[in-house]
């Protein structure tokens, strides 16, 4: 499951759990992006990685990969999937993403190659229409509506509002300890 996870929240965890259950996946690997080319302002990759580790620690089916944050320069999904394919040769790869991200997929680096590397699971998000992409390598899944977004969590912290129950408790504590999101970008 690729994402910025800035910060990771309960919506991400519910989606991962639901996809793992529906597609009988042995493991869901969370892959925090290193330096996403489409987003200018993101928190330090190691903070986002550690928050993902904290958030997923209690679920044996979840793990977190450093693959993108250890790569120098911009991180692209196609490079991540190629590297995962090399590491997990005999495994079927499923790439979990939101329908909002899928709508931009044709602008991604080597977009035509993506379909041969993994089966895509596009999860609907409140306020984002499902895109019509004819491809037998995409499954669309509606997950119980959880109107939580990372950008809203960051804005709440910046405004001094609580994020309890939106993100896991350990992540709330990590954000407070490291003073994340207090300034426009911190």
From Swiss-Prot:
GO terms for biological process: NAD biosynthetic process. Keywords: ATP-binding, NAD, Nucleotide-binding, Nucleotidyltransferase, Pyridine nucleotide biosynthesis, Transferase. Its EC number is 2.7.7.18. Pathway: Cofactor biosynthesis; NAD(+) biosynthesis; deamido-NAD(+) from nicotinate D-ribonucleotide: step 1/1. It catalyses: nicotinate beta-D-ribonucleotide + ATP + H(+) = deamido-NAD(+) + diphosphate. GO terms for molecular function: ATP binding; nicotinate-nucleotide adenylyltransferase activity. It comes from the Bacteria. Catalyzes the reversible adenylation of nicotinate mononucleotide (NaMN) to nicotinic acid adenine dinucleotide (NaAD). Belongs to the NadD family. This is Probable nicotinate-nucleotide adenylyltransferase. It comes from Tropheryma whipplei (strain TW08/27). The lineage of its organism: Bacteria, Bacillati, Actinomycetota, Actinomycetes, Micrococcales.
């Amino acid at each position: 499951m690729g994402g910025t996870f800035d910060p990771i929240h309960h919506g991400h965890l519910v989606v991962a759990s639901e996809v793992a259950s529906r597609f009988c996946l042995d493991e869901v690997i969370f892959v925090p992006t290193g330096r996403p080319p489409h987003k200018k302002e993101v928190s330090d990759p190691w903070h986002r990685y550690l928050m993902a580790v904290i958030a997923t620690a209690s679920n044996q089916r979840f793990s977190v990969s450093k693959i993108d944050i250890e790569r120098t320069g911009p991180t692209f999904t196609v490079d991540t999937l190629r590297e995962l394919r090399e590491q997990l040769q005999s495994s079927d790869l499923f790439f979990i993403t939101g329908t909002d991200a899928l709508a931009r997929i044709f602008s991604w680096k080597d977009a035509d190659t993506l379909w041969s590397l993994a089966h895509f699971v596009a999860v609907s998000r409140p306020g984002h229409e499902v895109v019509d992409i004819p491809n037998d390598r995409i499954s669309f899944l509606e997950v119980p509506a959880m109107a939580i977004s990372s950008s809203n969590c960051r804005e709440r912290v910046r405004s001094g509002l609580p994020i309890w129950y939106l993100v896991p408790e350990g992540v709330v504590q990590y954000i407070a300890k490291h003073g994340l999101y207090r300034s426009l970008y911190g």
